[in-house]
Every structure is written in structure tokens, then in C-alpha cells.
Amino acid sequence: MLDLAARVAMRGVGAVEPNPTVGCVIGREHAGGVEILAIGHHGRFGGLHAEAEALRVCSERGIDPAGATAWVTLEPCNHQGKQPPCARALIDARIKRVVYASPDPNPVAIGGAGALREAGVTVDESDESDAAIRSSAPFRYRIETGLPWVVAKWAQTIDGFVATSAGDSKWISNLFSRRSVHRLRAKVDAIVTGIGTVLADDPLMTARDVPLRRLARRVVVDPKGRLPLDCQLVRSVTGGAPLTVAVSPSVLERNADWYRTLLERGVDVVAFEPDAEGRFVIADLLRWLARERQVSTAMVESGPKLLGAMHEEGLLNQLLVFIAPTLLGDPAAQSSVGGSPIASIAGAARYRLDHMKRFGDDVRLLYRATD
């Protein structure tokens, strides 16, 4: 049942953040299995939570859920926010048993399991559904670390290159793969890139030709303040697509006219102090995005330098890799991720393959960082 709740929960991705995606199944347990009474998911920010939605469906169908079991991907909340406490709703509905996959780490909402037990409800935390645990991972990660969940995306050739030695990369992946990227852009809170990608490609970095649930914030890591004022990213701000440019503090004085012009055009320009070695600290930017702009999920679409820096800071939660049926065989071509040399394979980072999908002759691989 938790696997089903997880599938239902994913319907809310891109519509509920910064809240968690949550799914709920209410059913009656019998010797021969489970009779499903209702399912529900958190469908939009500010809307009914998954448990309340499932109970609403029961009411709409004239079903009394008393004595039933509720399977929920995340521990029911125990606070009054935009919606009343889910724990109280389950108690009032006389639910007999609640099974949840992950405890709620939010200090504002914790305590649901305890409240249910005090009311006589049997409560079990279950780790049997990896899908249910993963469904709320971005939310739990942000609450526990103060960082958004980061997905690094790139397209590469069979031999692992993202561009030729001359810098050409259009297009490695096919049309179907690129359309899937636009669908993903429509579901994340932010899209992060580096100034090198902007100068080379002048990208727009918006979701196009797909249903839009939100306009993702475009974020450019630009320590030296080189973003062209006439680039597509800046021009599109007036159309409602937000833009943040992350710079070093010295830029604000050295490029005062540039800074003022960007502010006048509605661009966020935020300065971050470098580390002791003068390097831009990407984690500081990500924490600011999570805290000040409520970014829960961010997708990185950049060149190897920024990806390598984020990898070395341990900031990549998932890798979304498109492999195209193209072989370059170019020793000077650009690899997907930069970084410092590693002497042995044993010292390399390991990721777990979560999902694989084919788009024509392209293959999309989704990897997750191991604990």
C-alpha cells in the first residue's frame, strides 16, 4: 500500500513545494488482502493534505472509514497551518491504524505519531517501501540540511563527452529527450547554471511547450559579474521568469552600473563571500535559495566546471544523465563533470541507479547519491 501511496504522492511534484509531496491510501485489512476505500495526495500548496483528501473522497463516496487503516508516505502533521492537523483528522475519522514511511523532520509539524498513539490509534513506521521513503526525500533533506535537493542534468555521448573540442554541443540528445527536460523544468523550483554556459549558449532556461505549474527561478553562478545585460535570461525577466545572479561582493562596487541595471530590470543580485582560498562557495548560494526563495528542488544544467565544483562540495543528490548514440573519439572533447584528479577508482563517488528510460535511441539514467 505504501508503494501505491508513493505513486499517488508524485502527482503533486511541482505544485506543492515548499511543502512535501505526500500520498495516502485508506483501506480495510482483511485476511485475503486490503479493500481500498480511497486514495489522496497533496495536490497544491495551501490545498488539502493527502490524508484530508483521502478522507474527503471517503465522505464523497458515502464511505465510513472508521476502523480502517491509513498508509501515508510521511508521518501525519500535528500543527495548524494553511490546513488543520492531519493527525487530528485521522483521529476524528476513527482510523484504527496508521502506517507511515518516514518521520516528519519539520519541528513545526512533528508529533503526529505521538498524538495518534495517545488517541488509541495503532501507529507503525515502515521501511518496506523504498519508493515511499524517496517520495519525501527532497523535503526532508531541505529541513534537515537547509539545502535544496539538487538534480544535476546533462546529455553526453557514448564515450562520456558533453561537447566537442571546439565547444559544439547542439544537439547531443534527441528531440524526445529534450522535451522530457522541459517537463522536468516545469516541476522544479530553480534551474542553476554557470556564467560559462550563459556566455557560450545564451540559454533561456525556461520550460517550453509543456503544461506549466510554476516558473522556475533561473540562477546564474557569476562570481566576477560578467552576465551580459542583453542576454535572454535578463530579457525574459519582464515576462515573469525570475532570475538570480550570484556574485562576489567586490562586483557590487566594481560593476556598480551593471549591478544597478540588473536591479532595475527585476533581477536578484546576491553577493556571497568567497572561502579562505578565494573560491565561490556554492553551498552558501543554495542555502540562501532555500531560506529566502523557498527553493526545495533545483536542477543544474551547466558545464563541467560548475558540476565539478558542486560534486566536490557534496551537493549533488541525483544525476539525470542522457546518453546519446554518438561516439566522438575526440581526446580533447569536454567531459561531463570536472574536478580534481583522483588516483584510484576506490576513491570515486558512487551513485545508485534509480530509474532508466529510453527515448528513441537515447537512454535516460537517474542516479541517486548513496548515503
Which residues does each PLM region occupy?
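Short gly/pro/ser/thr-enriched loop/turn and capping motifs at secondary-structure boundaries
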Residues: P105-V108, L199, R226-P228, L252-E253, ...
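Flexible, gly/pro- and Lys/Arg-enriched active-site loops
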Residues: E312-Y351
